[in-house]
C-alpha cells in the first residue's frame, strides 16, 4: 500500500520532518537520500511530502539562501501602530514588499502600542532605514507611531526543530 493512501503513519512523518528540518543534504539526488533514510521508495517519499503539503503540515520545499553569507548583515524588526480597520489590507501590502521577510499582526500590549511587525534586511544600516521609510510611506495616515528594533547579535537562529522533543 502506498504511503500517501495508508492511514497516517505518525512515526514515518515525524522521521521525515526530523531528517529535513535542518535542510536537505547537498547530494546529487536528495529525494533518493531521503527515501533511503526513511526505508521507503522515492515515489512513496514524494507522495508523503505531497500529502503533508496538501494537509498544510508543510508549506513548501524550497532552497533558503543564507542572507548573511549573501552580504545582508543588517536587519530590523519594524513595529507599527496601525489603524485596526486598515491592518488587514496594509499588512498584506507590507508583507508583499521584497525587502520584508516576515510580517505579523500582533495584539497591542499595555505600554506597547504596536500591532504590525515587519522584519527588513539590508546590506547596511542605511538600507534598513530606507526600507522603514518606504513602509512608513505605504502606511500613510493609518500609521500613528513606529519604531525599529535592530539586532546587535544573533544568539540563536533556527527554524522549528522537532528532533529531540519529547511528548508529555
Swiss-Prot record:
The keyword Lyase applies. Belongs to the Ahb/Nir family. The keyword ATP-binding does not apply. GO terms for molecular function: lyase activity. Probably forms a complex composed of NirD, NirL, NirG and NirH. All proteins are required for the total conversion of siroheme to didecarboxysiroheme. Involved in heme d1 biosynthesis. Catalyzes the decarboxylation of siroheme into didecarboxysiroheme. Pathway: Porphyrin-containing compound metabolism. The lineage of its organism: Bacteria, Pseudomonadati, Pseudomonadota, Gammaproteobacteria, Pseudomonadales. Disruption phenotype: Insertional mutagenesis results in the loss of respiratory nitrite reductase activity in vivo and in vitro. Mutant strains synthesize a periplasmic cytochrome cd1 that lacks heme d1. It comes from the Bacteria. Pfam families: AsnC_trans_reg2 (PF17805), NirdL-like_HTH (PF22451). It catalyses: siroheme + 2 H(+) = 12,18-didecarboxysiroheme + 2 CO2. Keywords: Lyase. InterPro entries: AsnC_trans_reg2 (IPR040523), HTH-Siroheme_Decarb (IPR050684), NirdL-like_HTH (IPR053953). This is Siroheme decarboxylase NirH subunit. Its EC number is 4.1.1.111. Signal peptide: none annotated.
Amino acid at each position: 500500500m502506498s504511503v500517501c493512501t495508508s492511514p497516517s503513519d505518525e512515526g514515518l512523518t515525524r522521521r521525515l520532518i526530523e531528517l529535513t528540518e535542518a535542510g536537505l543534504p547537498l547530494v546529487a539526488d536528495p529525494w533518493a537520500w531521503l527515501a533511503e533514510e526513511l526505508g521507503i521508495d522515492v515515489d512513496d517519499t514524494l507522495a508523503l511530502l505531497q500529502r503533508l503539503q496538501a494537509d498544510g503540515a508543510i508549506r513548501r520545499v524550497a532552497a533558503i539562501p543564507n542572507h548573511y553569507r549573501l552580504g545582508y548583515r543588517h536587519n530590523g524588526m519594524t513595529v507599527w501602530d496601525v489603524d485596526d480597520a486598515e491592518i488587514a489590507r496594509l499588512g498584506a501590502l507590507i508583507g508583499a514588499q521584497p525587502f520584508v521577510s516576515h510580517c505579523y499582526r500582533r495584539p497591542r500590549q499595555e505600554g506597547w502600542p504596536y500591532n504590525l511587525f515587519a522584519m527588513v534586511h539590508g546590506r547596511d544600516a542605511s538600507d534598513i532605514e530606507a526600507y522603514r521609510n518606504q513602509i512608513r510611506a505605504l502606511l500613510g495616515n493609518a500609521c500613528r507611531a513606529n519604531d525599529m528594533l535592530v539586532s546587535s547579535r544573533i544568539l540563536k537562529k533556527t527554524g522549528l526543530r522537532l528532533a529531540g522533543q519529547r511528548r508529555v
